[in-house]
């Protein structure tokens, strides 16, 4: 799709690798960067929407439903993962941070707004 000039939407990219494996599991960030470069070259998303939520709010939400394999991790793991995303966001202008601690309808509206703004800029550019 990219080669044909199309758009690709992903729910995860290498930012998740840095956050979960690098920060969460404390793997070597430099080695992850080498792998990222080797696998994807200079390919990066044009925009990244990061839905940020405080670890305590996330824990409350997780407790209200069935957990998956990642959600059984300890709180300190998620604190490190969140910091990984926030660090990546501070290093890359493509990040749009959305406060996912807000009610669902507000988060959805913010996602729609950021996506619409990006599409308008892309069509002008």
What spans do the regions from the language model cover?
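Loop/turn-to-beta-strand initiation segments
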Residues: 4-7
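Short, well-ordered beta-to-alpha junction loops that form the rim of enzyme active sites
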Residues: 11-13, 100-101
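Hydrophobic/aromatic beta-strand patches that form the interior of the parallel beta-sheet core
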Residues: 9, 47-49, 96-98
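A glycine- and Lys/Arg-enriched "phosphate-lid" helix/loop adjacent to the NTP-binding pocket
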Residues: 12, 17-83
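N-terminal phosphate/diphosphate-binding loop that engages ATP/GTP or pyrophosphate donors
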Residues: 1
């Amino acid at each position: 799709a990219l080669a044909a000039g199309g758009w690709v939407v992903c729910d995860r990219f290498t930012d998740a690798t840095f956050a979960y494996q690098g920060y969460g599991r404390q793997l070597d960030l430099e080695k992850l960067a080498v792998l990222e470069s080797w696998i994807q070259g200079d390919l990066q998303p044009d925009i990244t929407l990061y839905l940020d939520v405080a670890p305590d709010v996330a824990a409350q939400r997780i407790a209200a439903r069935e957990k998956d394999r990642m959600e059984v991790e300890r709180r300190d793991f998620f604190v490190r993962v969140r910091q990984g995303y926030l660090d990546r966001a501070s290093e890359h202008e493509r990040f749009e941070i959305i406060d996912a601690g807000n009610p669902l309808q507000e988060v959805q509206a913010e996602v729609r707004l950021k996506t619409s703004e990006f599409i308008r800029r892309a069509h002008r550019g």
